[in-house]
Curated annotation (Swiss-Prot):
It catalyses: a plastoquinone + NADH + (n+1) H(+)(in) = a plastoquinol + NAD(+) + n H(+)(out); a plastoquinone + NADPH + (n+1) H(+)(in) = a plastoquinol + NADP(+) + n H(+)(out). This is NAD(P)H-quinone oxidoreductase subunit J, chloroplastic. The gene is ndhJ. One of its GO terms (molecular function) is quinone binding. It holds the Pfam family Complex1_30kDa. It is found in: Plastid, Chloroplast thylakoid membrane. It comes from Manihot esculenta (Cassava). It is an enzyme of class 7 (translocase). Gene3D superfamilies: NADH:ubiquinone oxidoreductase, 30kDa subunit.
Length: 158
């Protein structure tokens, strides 16, 4: 069984993998990092004009890192907007995914948080730098193989 968007992508020859539906019936797709930017632009043109959220997670210690995008198709007069969940997996050794900041501006802080916590580099992001941790912090705190430092000194501002 395929979802509506997956069938549309297949019809237009766009490479993806259908992962199923979540508990709310939202279609979930996997897109390769090298295809993500062009498919993101196509999804925006198709009507997915709102990035509801972006998050990231560590799939397994030593394994892949995932960047997850929840997109919504908002139209006037529609009570139940169409939603889709996109997952983009990147290798741990060189986790690079194209930024969608230039497609959905709301990706700005969300991609920065994913970079800060998991070390996923979002190519072509205009301000990719730490947003929660100090600039001097070493490592990526939400990776499953992260070893927390025994001590970290936060210096006073004065």
């Amino acid at each position: 069984m395929q979802g509506r968007l997956s069938a549309w992508l297949v019809k237009h020859g766009l490479v993806h993998r259908f992962l199923g539906f979540d508990y709310q019936g939202i279609e979930t797709l996997q897109i390769k990092p090298e295809d993500w930017h062009s498919i993101a632009v196509i999804l925006y043109v198709y009507g997915y004009n709102y990035l509801r959220s972006q998050c990231a997670y560590d799939v397994a210690p030593g394994g892949l890192l995932a960047s997850v995008y929840h997109l919504t198709r908002i139209e006037y007069g529609i009570d139940q907007p169409e939603e889709v969940c996109i997952k983009v997996f990147a290798p741990r050794k060189n986790p690079r995914i194209p930024s969608v900041f230039w497609v959905w501006k709301s990706a700005d802080f969300q991609e920065r948080e994913s970079y800060d916590m998991l070390g996923i580099f979002y190519d072509n992001h205009p301000r990719l730098k730490r947003i929660l941790m100090p600039e001097s912090w070493i490592g990526w705190p939400l990776r499953k193989d992260y070893i927390a430092p025994n001590f970290y000194e936060i210096q006073d501002a004065h």
